[in-house]
Amino acid sequence: MSEMTLNAAEQPIDELVGWVKQHDFSLNLTTERLAFLIAIAVLSNERFDEELGEGELHDAFAIVTRLFDETGEASAFRANNAINEMVKQRLISRFVSEITDGASIYRLSPLAIGITDYYVRHREFSKLRLSIQLSMVADEMAKAIEAAQKGGTPGHWKKNVYGILKYSVGEIFDQIDLNQRVMDEQQQSVKQQIADLLNKDWREAINNCEALLSETSSTLRELQDTLQAASDELQTQILDIQEIVYGDPELEFIEEALFGLQMKLDRITSWGQQAIDLWIGYDRHVHKFIRTAIDMDKNRAFSSRLRQSVKDYFDSPWYLTYADAERLSDLRDEALVLRDDEVTGQVPMEVEYEEFQQVNDELAERIGDMLKAHKDQGAPIDLSVVLRDYLAQHPHTHHFDLARIVVDQAVRLGYSESDYQAVQPDWKAINEFGAKVQANVIDRY
């Protein structure tokens, strides 16, 4: 919020309304009138003194009228009416010069400059512009700190410190804030472009959407990095001046100015991170929409468009890109049961020098007991039970390698009928650390 807005906000609303009514302020800019005002601004920027004669305004009006041919011809009468409307609305100021034999000259008013700046000068919020503005702020703050360290009379503080903080640093902060609002509008424009792409051409929409999303994300990230790097230095400079004026009642107006700058700096910095967070959320939303619409295609909209594209191929040729991934092998096939190779892996230190036959005999004894129970009671052999009992006797760090040995021996001793029926087994825990095994019970041996 600028200083002018702050001063206006402190006044009662009825006084402000009376002031507007007293001066008969009003704005009525049609598209044609706005284009005329922008044309005047462009021509003014090309002039050293930014002054235009009446003939130049007529030329600008003729250029605009050619593009708005439905409104009528570019007559001198219509041009004068348009100029008089601009003067009445305090958008341009008219001066009569004796040097030019009474001919009028025109200049843009501050209101017109503010309007045209929005449409002409602030359409691009770049990292370079932001860096320059932040550099200017740092230089002005350095001047204010130097003046504050020297000290002096209240007049010295008013001129050399307060004046810089309020009219130099504060206005640059307001300009950065305005540029950030322009960036907000650019984001809305990108969102509209993405929406139009998704509604118009599905085949081209995905790549274009990705480019727009990536470009905007990169821009926001660069701007935020620039803001973050500069804000730390500015924060330090504000604190340095606050430390100098702290406790001095005669310099309370300096503290108030610093407080206002602190609020503006916080708002500028927080805007960058908030803009990134909001854009990340929108980015995810768009990607989720694309995945849902294309992968799921519940309403068959994409399918119908594809069929139509195939039908219109000879009128509008296109290329088809497809992916042919390798098939996944089923590990529970006949080869797994009948294979005779050993599972390799690092052997734990405790069993590195242990005879493999000893490990095999121990496993065979356990499985033999279970086979006997299976023979006597018809109970299947559950590999998860064998693994859980055996691994419980060894350290956690050895479980993986030992489990491989157990599985290797188990598949040699028997197999499961369910493997041949393509039955998917459940995952079962084999230790207390989250390890699980997925294997059908052995019921054939």
UniProtKB/Swiss-Prot annotation:
Keywords: Calcium, Cell cycle, Cell division, Chromosome partition, Cytoplasm, DNA condensation. Belongs to the MukF family. One of its GO terms (molecular function) is calcium ion binding. CDD domains: MukF_C, MukF_N. It is found in: Cytoplasm, Nucleoid. Interacts, and probably forms a ternary complex, with MukE and MukB via its C-terminal region. The complex formation is stimulated by calcium or magnesium. It is required for an interaction between MukE and MukB. This is Chromosome partition protein MukF. The lineage of its organism: Bacteria, Pseudomonadati, Pseudomonadota, Gammaproteobacteria, Vibrionales. Involved in chromosome condensation, segregation and cell cycle progression. May participate in facilitating chromosome segregation by condensation DNA from both sides of a centrally located replisome during cell division. Not required for mini-F plasmid partitioning. Probably acts via its interaction with MukB and MukE. Overexpression results in anucleate cells. It has a calcium binding activity. Residues 213-241 are annotated as: Leucine-zipper. Pfam families: KicB, MukF_C, MukF_M. The keyword Oxidoreductase does not apply. GO terms for cellular component: cytoplasm; nucleoid. InterPro entries: Chromosome_partition_MukF, MukF_C, MukF_C_sf, MukF_M, MukF_M_sp, MukF_WHTH, WH-like_DNA-bd_sf, WH_DNA-bd_sf. SUPFAM superfamilies: MukF C-terminal domain-like, Winged helix' DNA-binding domain. GO terms for biological process: cell division; chromosome condensation; chromosome segregation; DNA replication.
